[in-house]
Amino acid sequence: MRGMTTPASLPFTGNDAADRLLVDEPLALLIGFALDQQVTVQKAFSGPAELKRRLGHLDAARIAAMDPDELNAVFRERPALHRFPGAMAGKVQALCAAVSRDFGNDARRVWSEAPDGPSLEARLLSLPGIGGMKAKSLIAVLGKQFDVRPPGYEDVAPTWPTLGDVDSAEALASYQAGKRAHKAALRETARG
């Protein structure tokens, strides 16, 4: 694996502190990806910072050990952390349990110990809340923003635009506009 670099932040939220947290705490990045569905990128990736504010930490083992009803209440506190706070509380708790159990409570190990690209993808896919498209996008972010490119990275890296290409607020706006246009085209095709 090439040497891991660390960007100053990932410009996904519009909030400097939340953007820095995505870089400073690897679990925050994973939680952001888990939350990235049916809400804006900004809402999904600001979730880890708000969760940390509410809990006082982002420790995978501690989150995994929480009473599910208590975590659910934290997610539902206004403003809710997600459009579907109950479901996402469960996903994040399962994600944290996997990080704690399978990666020694160190989210960075998910990628830092992957010997090759296919293993990196398999490790990401093993995490609750991370499906195929999210894994590909995470691979792109790790490769393009953190220089995490183990042997065989090119075999699993996406060839389409992803959050890995977002390095500024302008790039995020362009990415989101492209994603909306793609979804509109798919809907139009489905109407036939």
Model-derived segments and spans:
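C-terminal accessory module of base-excision DNA glycosylases/AP lyases that mediates lesion recognition
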Residues: 1-20, 24, 117-122, 132-192
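Short, aromatic/basic-rich helix-turn unit that serves as a nucleic-acid recognition element
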Residues: 30-34
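Structural motif
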Residues: 17-28, 38-40, 82-87
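Alpha-helical ds-nucleic-acid-binding substructure associated with the helix-hairpin-helix region
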Residues: 51-126
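Short Gly/aromatic-enriched secondary-structure transition segments
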Residues: 45-51
